[in-house]
Structure formats: structure tokens, C-alpha cells
Amino acid sequence: MPSTALSPPSRPPAQSYDSYSSSLSPSSPRFHAAAGSHGRRSPSPSRLESLLDGPHVPPRSPSRKIRSALSRHIRPHITPRTLTPVFLWTLALWLIHHFLFPLSSPFAKLAKPKAEEHFLSTTFPPPAQRLGDDRLDSVDPRWRAYHPLPAPEPPFPRLRPTRFLPPQCLEQWFAEGETLCGAKEMGEEETLDATWLWVNGSDHRWRDSMVEWREKENVNSPERHYREQNELVHSMRSVLDALPGHLRTFHLILADYPFNYPEDLELVPSSIIPDLEVAASKSKGRRHPRELPGAPASLANLTERVTPESISPTLASHLQSEWRILQTPTWLDFSRRDPSDPSHPFHPYSVSKAGEIRQHYAEASYPTLRYASHWEVFHIPSVDRDGRQELMGEREWRENEWKKKALPSFNSMAIESRIGWLPGLADAIIALNDDFFLLRPHAVSDFHSPLYGSVIRFEHGYNQQVKPDVEKNHINDPGEMGGLYHANALLSRRFPRRLRPYFAHVPKVITRGLHHEASLMFQEALTESSTRRFREMKIGEGDVQMQWLLTSLRVERWREALLWTWTVANMGTLGGSQDHWDNDTRRAIKNLFGFTENDDDVVKIEVHRGERWTLEPGRMQRVFRQAGWEAPKATEFLFSSMDGIMPPLLRSGEDPAQNDRCIIDLNRCFGLFWTREEDVLSSDMMKRLTFQYPECGDCMIMALVTASGTLGLNAFFPPKETTITAPELGPGDAYPKFLPPPHLPLTPTWHEADFSLANILSTTALPGEQVDIRQYCMRLLSRYLYLDAKSVSHFHMMKSAEHARRVFRMIQGDPKVSILGMNDDIESDYDEVRGLMNEWFEMRWPRKAVWERDWDPVKDRYND
């Protein structure tokens, strides 16, 4: 029967069973609706009739058709039987890619990588848990059996970025010297870590070791430097009282000894023996301690006593070879060190359990106390000077051989040089001696902030400056002069040779990032100086005063970064060039100094320091208030790096006005670029101005700061939206897994450094990346910001009882004193002086820290 065309709304005539096929032809207005219905592969005449009798059904949307097709064709295959192989193959590929060798992706080139994805975080990762239960208190308060943390995973140190301001805030701050950013954009205020070195010279075990090594090294090191006067506990209390709620972690660096078996077995907590048996058996390839010859029949017996007979031979060997003994302050309760532990008195769980409704902010943000032994911080770099490629060779063997020469160490300078290797260290640190005390409330900004950088307290006497020469008669100096001279000699090989100011005897501000830079830049000298067990030894060129080196390194890296920003990143990129000073540069310099057509014969230019408002009264307070951060409370600021570089110190009687002007000799400073109008490499000009003729670089900085106006440093930077393409990967080079932050070469001398844009970006940008060079320079400068400041501080030598009384009366009578340094080199009345000191300490800081053994949960709590 021939088909009949359907034209609604008229009812179609009755049809035989086989006539319905014509109604589903493509020409039928019902075709799409019928064909799209689920499960209608053979519609019966009755269903077709009902469909045709019903109202008109609009065509289905494409998305519904897709869902229908997916449901019809894919759902039957989504079963455990089909999904399990897919999951197992995916897991296998992931394991191969992450643990054996990286697998290339066919889509890798379609996704453009971003540099931000390759930077490490500013936060140093927390250290691993030590073997055993490190939350337990020590069995004996004098010593602690512990399993050292492993060496940092290579390559180490990996340079991490400083905390940068957000891009829009960074631009405003560096270009204009102020910012519209508020608390939301700026983020939370920085918190600080604090570090102390401590040793108990009265400990017979430590004293016997020192005497033995003193005889081996044939030196005479006085024991009075190591006497314990109970200063540490009160130094820590003073910091807690001065900065409540603003401290992240306290770090104690402690001496340690090899594990003597079986004598030290009694220092191992019996409760951890079962776990140690399991761990020791696994390290020896055994599956269970019961398989060990001589192991106890029941693990339950292991917790009853710890004797040589109650542990397996494998565990005994494990303890002797891998465990060590830590010297500890007797007042320290190791079970109350970590506020994140629910059993800690200040943990929210413990607070709510005690029925307290409200917690004091100082307790809610109480710092963690971490300890590290000399063994755990004495390491050598396993990375090249760029901070990116791992050094090849027998690294572990080299480090172990070096440790044999360096440890045990009785030299505080050698130990201080390892502070940056502390596990879990923050970027901003206050480094204290145990005889440093904070007497007044302080803000974080009294020490460090992302806006102004680290606060340095220099001494400003001309004759107190440190000479740049290594003197043979100071190589074995028991004081610090030899270490200072050596440190300045290292700086003078890398930067201009000059006198550099000494710093006040107060807590020092260190940034972990700068410590790691110094560890790479001067790694040979620091590795050798760290093997000097005593200051009196005649090894190498002497000790290195690391804290002073880091302080002065910050000043020099800032100056270097300023000049690189102008000479290479700004002048070197004019007119589309990436590496040359040319006619465009000459025109820019003439415009900077206001040359006219008649000034071609000008050879010398007198530069005057312009007016600056960076440190005008009230400005800093407004900036911190706008950011939602606390303004400084106990510091007077003398100079900000946002105003260029510190003026040189003058001799007594010299006119201070001479630091407000300078002369630029164009022929001398710019050489053939100016005299013969030859094009030169921008990196060569950078070396000329920065190192060969440092007075030229200093005067150019003054000129550019003046040209920037009253605030900001805009004259240094390249124009906005200046982009430079980073070099592509060279033959055989591997794609970087992580990127170091913007930084300049870490070579030990300036002669061998390559300051070209291509070289700098080859290690601090992704291959082929389009780098916003203006933002890059601002991030570079952020690493080295600093303030020169002074606080009302006292430093006293406790010689006798009468002298001690006078000192304490004077301090108590002057509430302006904010920092106290107290040297206990007692010459007479030793017991009386010690009693006076402890009496004054307890009067000044009666509230005990929560980790002290006799901490009282009522008397020692914080109150509003």
C-alpha cells in the first residue's frame, strides 16, 4: 500500500500493521519526535496511533539527544569489571611518572606553563616526625635519646621566594612609595620565629668531650664561656611577653653525643620499644621482630623494662648506629611543646574540656617549641650556585667526611652559620643569644615587614667599622674580631672593597632566603670555617661571623639589585635591545640630567640629594594601619632602603652635608660608551658602575632617587608592560621542576658573575616565558629591603656583685630600655652574682612558659 502523507491536525485513516513505517519517513512531521524516544526500536501500531492522536511534541534539543545517546551506549559498560582495569592502569602510570621517570604528555605543548606554578612556597615545609614518640617527655631531664631527622632532600637549599606584596600593591609601593591596598589585599601580618643556641658547660658529658677535643686540637679554650646561669629560660620568657600572639616557632639548637650502648639504653622510653623493634626489623629486611634471633617471645614484655636482655640484637645495633643523645635544659618538658597536640593545655580541645569559654589571644597563637641538634643542622649544600641543579657525586660520603671534621663543635660561630638549615624554619627570624632580653612590648614591624624589610641596628661610629682584610694574628682569635674580618674579606671579593659598619649587640633579624644565598655564594669558605671546633684553631682564614655577614650582605644585595634594575633591565632594554647600551641609552641619560643642545661638552655633573618623605613622622604608622598591621613600638628609624643606599659613616668632625652631594664624572663612569659613543653590553656597564668604580654607582643611585621624587623609586624601573622573552632550553637541558625566585648571580667574586638578562632569566624564568621585567625587578628588590634603626639598648658585663646591683638598679629606673644584653663573664663573687641575676630575672618575668616543668595552669595563664 502506498504511503500517505500526514498533515496535522486532521486524523489519519486507519492503516494496516505494515503501513506505520511510512509515517516514520524523514519527510514526516512526526519523524524526529518518534525517532528520539527512548527504547522505541519497533513501535507497535497502537503506540503509534496514540502518538499520532496526541498533541504535537516539539523536537528534542541537541543536548537531550546527546544525553540519551550516552545513556543508551555507555551506561551498560560502566561496571566494576570494566572500571577496575582502567583504574589500575592509571595508577600504574602515575607511579611510573612520579617515582621512576617522567612520562611526556601529548597535550603538554597545548598548555602554556606559568612561572608561578614552578615557584616554591614562601613557607618552609614542616620537618618529618622523628622515629619514636617525640611528644613524650625525656626520661632524664638532662639528656634525651632521639633519632636524628634525615638530611634535607636534595637539591638543598632550594631558594624560596620572599613574601611578595600582591602585584598591584607591589607596583604602587615601589613606583610611588605608597599604596592604596588595605588589609584585604595585604593579607595577614607576618609572624616571627626565634632561635637560640644553648649549651650547658656544667654537664660532665659535654665537659669531658670538650677537654678531650681541646687536647686533640692543641688549643686553650676557656671554660667560663660555657657556664650555665639559667639565662635561656628567662630570655624565652622575655620574648613571649614582648611579642604575644606574633610568634610562630621557637627553635633550640642543642649539643648532642653518640649513643653509648648499653649505658644510654635507660634514656629510651620503654613505651616506644615495641615500635622501635618493628622499625628496626624493617630496616634490616625482617618482617616482624619475632623473627629476630634472641627477640622476646611477646611484645607485651617489651614495655615492662628496657635492658640489653629485653631488646633484640637488631634493635641494639639500630640504636648504636642511628640514635644519638641530646643535651637538654632540665626545666624543659618535651610533652608540652606543640600547641597542635590535643593534649597541649592551649589546644582548643583542652581549653573546651577545661570548661573555658574564652581564650587569651596569646594562648590561642602560642608558638611551637622545636629542637634541633648540631648533627641535624650541620650539612653542606647539595645544589649548584644557581640553586636549581643538584650537585652530582658521592654527596652523602662527602658530607659524612666533613661532619667528622666539624663535630662535635664548641664554636658558636660555626654553629650559627648553620641556622638557615634548621628544619621547619620561617623566612623571618629573630636570632638571639641566651643572654639577650626584650624589656618592652614590641611589634613584628620592630624587626621585619614585607613593606620595609628587615630592621638592622648598626653602630654608627666610624672607628667601629669592620676592616676588609684577613689578619693572620686574628685567625685564631677567641673573640669575634677574626670572624668579622674574614666575613668582610669575603664580602669585599664579591662586592666593592670597603669598611662596613658593625652592628649593635642586640637580637639580629635574619631571613632564611638570604641565609641560603650566603650558603651558596660563600659555600667553600663556610664549609671550611665550620670545621673549626674551637675559635682558637688555625684552620683556613678564620671563623666567619655569620650574623654580621648576612646583615651586610643584605645591604650589598640591595645596592646591586638597584643598579642592575637600572643598567640592565631598564637602560639595556631601550629601543627593543636586550643587552646593549646604545644611542637610546645616551639620550635617556642626557634627559635624566637635563642636558640641552649646548651641553655636549659637559664632563662632570654635581648631584644633590633630593627631599624624601619615606620616614617623615606619622607616615609609617599610617601605612601599617592601612595594611591592618601593628606599627613599630620600640624603634627609631634612621634610614630606609626605599631612599636608596645608606650614606657612608663619617669621621668625627666631618661635615654631614657632604653625604648629600656627589660628582659624576661622565668619562670615568661610562668610559668608551660616553667618550667615543661606542655601544657596550649592559652587563659590562653594570659591573663598571657597581664594582669597578663604586663611587659612580653610588652617585647614580642618588641621582635616580632624586629623579624619582619624594617617594618611591620609579626612575630605576623599565616602563610598564616591558616584556622580555626568557631563553629557550639548551641542548640536553632538562625542563625545571621548580624555579628559584628572582635573584642575581651567587658567585663568590663579581668578576666571574654574568649579569646579562639572558643568563639571569635562564635560571629564574621558564624557557621561552614572556617576563614582565618591571614586576620581576620589584620582586627582586623585595628580597633585600631593609631599615637602619636604633633602639634603647644596654649591654653589660657582670664583673662582680656590686656591679650587678648597679646595673639592675639602672635598668629598673629607665623604662625606655627595650633590649638588654648581659654577658656573665664573672670575675668575682660568682655565686652571689648568679643569685642576683636569677632573683632579678624572676622579678622581671615571673610568668613561666607552658613548656617549663613547673608551669602552673592557674598562676601562669595570660589575663586581659
From Swiss-Prot:
Top-level EC class as recorded in UniProt: transferase
Comp. bias intervals (Low complexity): 16-29, 42-52
Q: Where is this region: Disordered?
A: 1-66
Cofactor field: Mn(2+)
Q: Where are the transmembrane segments?
A: 83-103
Record-listed E.C. numbers: 2.7.8.32
- Give residue ranges on the Lumenal side: 104-864
Q: Does the keyword Translocase apply?
A: no
A Gene Ontology CC term for this entry? Golgi membrane
Ranges per topology, Cytoplasmic:
1-82
Q: Name one GO molecular function term.
A: glycosyltransferase activity
Localization, per the record, is:
Golgi apparatus membrane
Instruction: Enumerate the Pfam families for this protein.
Output: Stealth_CR3, Stealth_CR4
Q: PANTHER family recorded for this chain?
A: N-ACETYLGLUCOSAMINE-1-PHOSPHOTRANSFERASE SUBUNITS ALPHA_BETA, PTHR24045
Q: What does the UniProt record say this protein does?
A: Xylosylphosphotransferase that is specific for UDP-xylose as a donor and mannose as an acceptor to form a xylose-alpha-1-phosphate-6-mannose linkage. Functions in the O-glycosylation of proteins en route through the secretory pathway.
Protein name as it appears in the record = 3-O-alpha-D-mannopyranosyl-alpha-D-mannopyranose xylosylphosphotransferase
Q: What species is given as this protein's source?
A: Cryptococcus neoformans var. grubii
Gene symbol of the encoding locus: XPT1
